[in-house]
Amino acid sequence: GRIRRSQREHGSAQTQGRWAYTKRLNTELGKKIAGAIVRYAEENHADVIVFEYLEMQGKISGKKKQKLHLWRKRDIQRRCEHQAHRKGMRVSRICAWNTSRLAYDGSGAVTRDWENHSLCTFQTGKRYHCDLSASCNIGARYFIRELLKPLPATERSLLEAKVPPVKRRTSCVYADLRKLHSEMELLKAA
């Protein structure tokens, strides 16, 4: 806003310093966030850091191409990946579709609170934090993928028949992971 307004009034040459300052500030913020993520993962002895695969390609058209995006998702994920590999951790990306939209308990779509956008209401009436629910769903999708990947096709299709939502990863939630795990335990016991 402020830089663009100044650029419109005084020309682009005078505002180059402001753009450079904002860019440096943004880069520094990306470094700090990536470092904090990897440090947190290392403190908790994590083997894998799981990110949502966010759409990071494509060009911005119109007036918005002048706008400097303050959320550096690509830079943060890239820096995290380099730092994690240096420390012997893996980085995995999960499809971001419906992670925030679906409740982790399997009750269906959530309704966001109008006053506090970080809270949501499940179909069951329970109020919960949206980002925490989305984090549960992201972790569940990763574990569902890792549990099903090494299985033979016949065993995998048997489990997918018993727990149908795991067939389509964009609708997987934490409740589906729990069902899948219990079905796998029953299959091992038999």
Where are these regions (language model features)?
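Positively charged, helix-rich recognition surfaces that bind polyanionic ligands
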Residues: 1-190
